[in-house]
């Protein structure tokens, strides 16, 4: 159902060691079964935020919690580690994320949001969801695509711990932009549209 490679498990265990005791991992999906599906990984305290609709998937030293209705969408999901300009980060491959529970045919050989002809917008959303946001989530943050301009510039917006973070400019220019341009050669650049407000929520102050 949900596979986490050994290297990814070790990485998560290390991250959890810096958190409050009994902290686990939550796997959530926004708009499952649609072309706009987005998955997210975050820290989770089961005793503090108990949800009767949750199921627990146990691993050797931690557990993943998710809502029961997501089971059909996370079949054959793999969480792994990749290295790029953002450093070491989590990567999520979930081929069934965009399909309805009632779909009779699932193409497991592709992971694009739009399986027939992925647009630049959908390619970027896919990369943000599966490669970049899993890493930012460990800092309590995320980034989303606002729009693609007529000259192929991606307008992005930071959320959570990335809003007001002193490392935001470095992250978007040295990490996110390089990653997106490498995977999407037609992209001409990235602009941060966030109205940054430093505060206790910011990861780096």
Curated annotation (Swiss-Prot):
InterPro entries (alphabetical): Fe/S_biogenesis_protein_NfuA, FeS_biogenesis, FSCA_dom_sf, HesB-like_dom_sf, NIF_FeS_clus_asmbl_NifU_C
Task: Please tell me where [4Fe-4S] cluster binds in this chain.
Answer: 162, 165
Question: For this UniProt entry, which residues form the secretion signal?
Answer: none
Q: Which Pfam families match?
A: Fe-S_biosyn, NifU
The record's family statement is: Belongs to the NfuA family.
What do we know about how this protein assembles, alone or with others?
Homodimer.
- The protein's name in its UniProt record: Fe/S biogenesis protein NfuA
Q: Which organism is it from?
A: Blochmanniella floridana
């Amino acid at each position: 159902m949900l596979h986490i490679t050994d290297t990814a498990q070790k990485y998560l265990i290390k991250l959890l060691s810096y958190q409050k005791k009994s902290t686990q991992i939550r796997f959530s999906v926004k708009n499952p079964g649609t072309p706009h599906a987005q998955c997210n990984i975050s820290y989770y305290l089961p005793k503090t935020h108990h949800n009767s609709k949750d199921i627990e998937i146990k691993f050797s030293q931690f557990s993943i919690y998710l809502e029961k209705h997501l089971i059909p969408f996370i079949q054959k999901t793999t969480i792994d580690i990749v290295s790029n300009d953002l450093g070491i980060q989590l990567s999520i491959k979930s081929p069934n994320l965009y399909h309805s529970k009632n779909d009779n045919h699932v193409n497991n050989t592709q992971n694009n949001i739009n399986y027939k002809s992925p647009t630049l917008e959908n390619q970027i959303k896919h990369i943000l969801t599966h490669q970049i946001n899993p890493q930012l989530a460990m800092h309590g943050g995320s980034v989303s695509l606002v729009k693609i301009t007529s000259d192929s510039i991606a307008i992005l917006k930071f959320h959570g711990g990335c809003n007001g973070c002193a490392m935001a400019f470095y992250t978007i220019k040295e990490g996110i932009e390089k990653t997106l341009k490498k995977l999407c050669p037609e992209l001409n650049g990235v602009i941060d549209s966030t109205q940054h407000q430093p505060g206790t929520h910011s990861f780096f102050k």
